[in-house]
Amino acid sequence: MDRKSWPWKKKSSEKTATVTEVVDQENGKKPSYIQISFDQYTNLNGLKDEVKSYEEKVTKLEDQIKDLDLKLSTANADIVAKEVLVKQHSKVAEEAVTGWEKAEAEASALKTHLETITLAKLTVEDRAAHLDGALKECMRQIRSLKEENEQKLHDVIATKTNQMDNLRAEFESRIGEYEEELLRCGAENDALSRSLQERSNMLMRISEEKSQAESEIEHLKNNIESCEREINTLKYETHVITKELEIRNEEKNMSMRSAEAANKQHLEGVKKIAKLEAECQRLRTLVRKKLPGPAALAQMKMEVESLGFGDHRQDHRQRRSPVRPSSPLMSPMSHMSQVSEFSLDNMQKFHKENDLLTERLLAMEEETKMLKEALAKRNSELQVSRNLCAKTANRLQTLEAQMMSKSPTKRGFEMPAEIFSRQNASNPPSMASMSEDGNEDARSVAGSLMSELSQSNKDKANAKIKKTESANQLELMDDFLEMEKLACLPNGSNANGSTDHSSADSDAEIPPATQLKKRISNVLQSLPKDAAFEKILAEIQCAVKDAGVKLPSKSHGANLNGLTEEKVIAMSNETTEEKVTIVEVITQELSDALSQIYQFVTYLSKEATACSENRTFSQKVQEFSTTFEGVLGKEKTLVDFLFDLSRVLVEASELKIDVLGFHTSTVEIHSPDCIDKVALPENKALQKDSSGEHYQNGCSQSSDSEIPDDCNGTSGYEPKLATCKFTTEEFEGLKLEKEKAESNLASCEADLEATKTKLQETEKLLAEVKSDLESAQKSNGMGETQLKCMVESYRSLETRSSELEIELTSLKGKIENLEDELHDEKENHREALAKCQELEEQLQRNNQNCPNCSVIEDDPKSKQDNELAAAAEKLAECQETILLLGKQLKSMCPQTEQVASSPSQEQQALNPEEEEYATSTNPQDSKLSSPSDKDTPSMNTMKSPVASKHRHTKSNSSSSSSGLTPEKHSRGFSRFFSTKAK
């Protein structure tokens, strides 16, 4: 609210100053500027014209008055002439004129003052009425707002208190329920924790039992795998035996054909014998006559050879017999070749030998059956050796890779290839399984020797010594092959042994192969690592002699050949064809195993690159991948594949890569004692059994529990024989125990999952309870904040109401001051009216006295008096009209500004006791305000929207002397209402 002072609240000194200023401005007739609208401006222009016309009339009247004054002066001059008579009259006339002038001046001043006071009173009354209405409206609105706000506050407070009570009751009930649930959940959690502890203990026990069961399962898996390997080997052996049976049938047919050919030759021999008998008779006669010399004996031998009884022996170095001879008497042709050495008395033995040949064929068939039975009995030993071979193939390949890396040439690997070629040529098809066993034994011994040679070759750099060692190795391998062939022969297959006796000995006694293995392994363990090669060879030969096995001589193969050269070539061709077909089938089956080996090597390369960056290992892996692709494309052989694989594994062992929990540094790969077999590429079927099953799962199946520490013959075979002797009942019992353990484990896991789900549900419930508590706390906080906001708003309303009351009191004080001022002005107005009445009475008395005094005067003088009275009346009428015009102008100016200012709701209201002021007015005030009441319609009609926009127009015309002080008051009112309207 604007704090400017009210324009009517002024002191009496200011009022007198304003009155003097009005008088001065009237005298000076300076132009005054007021704020009016356009319509009012047009009306005022018309009024100005009328005022100008009236002013012209006034000037005319003043001129007339001047003329009259001149006339009076002349009359006075005339009267002076009559001094004696006119002194009294002149004095009275002068006093009357001066009194009249003074009264006229006072009357004009009082009239102007009265006009200003009446205008101020009118404006103040209008403003008071307007303010009374505005104050009443404001008070009514404030009261209604107070009542509404109080009602709203009461309603809101009641609703919020009810809501808060309800929320508190709900939250307290919820909190009680949640506390009960928390107690229940705590009890359940305690029970669950106890049950979980028990379950954890149970799980620990179950985990221990599970670990034990897993170890047993692993053991059983290993046994099952060994059994599967046995089954696979048995299948393969059955396949080999079927092939052998086919070969034996073909051999039988060939032996029948050879027997027929032998019979034919025997008939020819009989004929030749007859001739020889005749010749013998002739010779006897000659002997009787004369003993022949050496030249004659040589001629006789040449004649016998020319007859067809030559020696059919072949060197065993070029070709060995494919059929195992049981005795030197197996082949009749060997005896036919020595006919010249026998005397003529032994010719009858040839007939018996034919019968012996047929009996020998039958005995050979029975012997093959017995050998099959002995083969079935020895399959356990053979399977153990093959399993060990499969487990140590990786290590042997790493050793071969080390030998390749340490030796400048590939003589260490050319040696097994040569052995392979010689064994394919020397081993007969009928003894395939025996020769495989013997070859595996030879591999084991040769592998240990090769590892020791690789150890000894580190410190030797002379090429001549290496050449001699390679030659010695070749001779040693040749001798070992012959030795293993003899060791694989059963005891009953000697020259004069029967089949029943051989089978009984093979069942009762330990096989010579195992004895020979034990002796050779003991010899190799007893010898130091740096021992000479010749010493190792001598010790092995002594062990072979102690075992009772004689090494075959190189010229012994000629005595064992019982077939002709054509039959040997045919048999070798048939065996090579069978082997080629077997190799082709096995290579197709080996493709999966080779791919698994390749995947394992790629896994090793990834592990190696992750552990450390080694370029040599990556190069060897790349070489292995190229060889793998070459093997798949049949560009390279499996030998190259195995060599590259051994190099990769050696490099991986040097890098000490941990593969599937088995660290490579835990196994001593350089020790010759831990080598069981050497993976020689002798037979592709054996490679399938060793490498394909070895890398069936992508990694080695060997472990520390399966490999013995000393790796000798007894410790290598006896545990395997013991573990393989599982009965079906024990196996089924173990399966049942395994199933029970799995079921118990599954039930425990299910219980654990159920408890976990319960615990998760309780945790969810706790989380929900916590979230509900948080939401309740949040809602409680929101309610408190709302209450605080309501309290603050109530406080702000109270402060506002207090401010309004203060403003009301201030307005009341101002209104009281205005009332006092109005009362003072009314008293002054009354005094002025009383003075005016007194002056009028004096004028009337003067006028009455003047005719009495001027009766004596002449008629012209009376005429002048009459004219003066008429002029005075006209002057009074003009003054009245001027006053009315000034009042209208004064009433128009504040009324326009009052219309422009709209009543504001922020105006303070008056008390009901002060509202009666507008009605309680004096009767004199009502009389005085009667002229203004006549002007109210004009003021009401003067309202226009132009004034509301505060357009200020300047008036160029000068108003009357009584128009300045109301203009100041109107400007004060306009400033007040313009600021409130803004």
UniProtKB/Swiss-Prot annotation:
SUPFAM superfamilies tied to this protein: Tropomyosin (SSF57997)
Alphabetically ordered keywords of this record: Coiled coil
Keyword presence, Electron transport: no
Coiled coil: 39-83, 125-291, 345-401, 452-475, 722-885
Keyword Coiled coil: yes
Pfam families named in the record: FPP
Ranges of compositional bias, category Low complexity: 323-333
Recorded family membership: Belongs to the FPP family.
Subunit structure: Interacts with WPP/MAF proteins.
Protein name: Filament-like plant protein 4
Gene name of the record: FPP4
